[in-house]
Amino acid sequence: MLVGLINPTSGEIKICGHDLKNDTKNALREVGAVVENPELYKYLSGRENLMQIARIRNVSKEDVEETIKLVGLEGRIDDKVKKYSLGMKQRLGLAASLLSKPKLLILDEPTNGLDPSGILDFREVVQKAAKERGMAVFVSSHILSEVQNLCDKVAFINDGVIKAVEKINSDTNSMETEKDIICLVSNDDKKMIENEVKKLTYVSSCKINDKGLQIILESNSTSRLVKHLACNNFNIEEIYKERKGLEQRYMELVEGGIR
């Protein structure tokens, strides 16, 4: 839909201020896309492939050379594409999508078929390109671990409906919006503390589990909770924030927590 292959059933799409339906040419000028395994001329070299696209898009030779260096293909760019590994073909496809210096890069299942080393290399190239070119990157993928490593914000979609849009904390590599904490207490105090915590206005829920007490509370309220429990002479062995990965959050939002 973002590249104009299908029309939206309702609403509108604007890319850099250009309406995709009424100003298609200018809107798509701001977009680059790599859809799974890019189609390339295997009998041509990598450079010849890029020059074919450059001529159509009026891209200078200098910009072609800059893009080749950006994706790290300068050592093999004059080899025939039929000799390229899958990872190199992905890099060449990425280079082709970057030639016109788009403001939006769309990647659809970009790491399908790549080995772990190829996935890591491709991820680093994308992150480098996004930083140097100052562009937004949309990634569509069913490989949640790769999305978690590559993206800083995710949208959970189920049956065409966005369930939530949340940030990923780059330092902890976990969902930034998560407010769960685990409170470890003695078994004798669990029920008593649960009843006390449920009275607090900044606590959404509190339940006993095998770890202790799982508490969901408002942001920046952990210190208030600890102070309240201490003032009421409850013995707390440990308290920590439970960090959830993308897969666990997906199960909660899309699958209802059922495994």
Language model segments and positions:
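ABC transporter nucleotide-binding domains
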Residues: 1-139, 144-164
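Short loop or secondary-structure boundary microenvironments that flank
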Residues: 17, 57, 186-187, 219, ...
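Alpha-helical elements of the RecA-like P-loop NTPase motor core of helicases
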Residues: 42, 145, 191, 223, ...
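ABC transporter nucleotide-binding domain
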Residues: 124-216
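C-terminal coupling/interaction segments
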Residues: 217-259
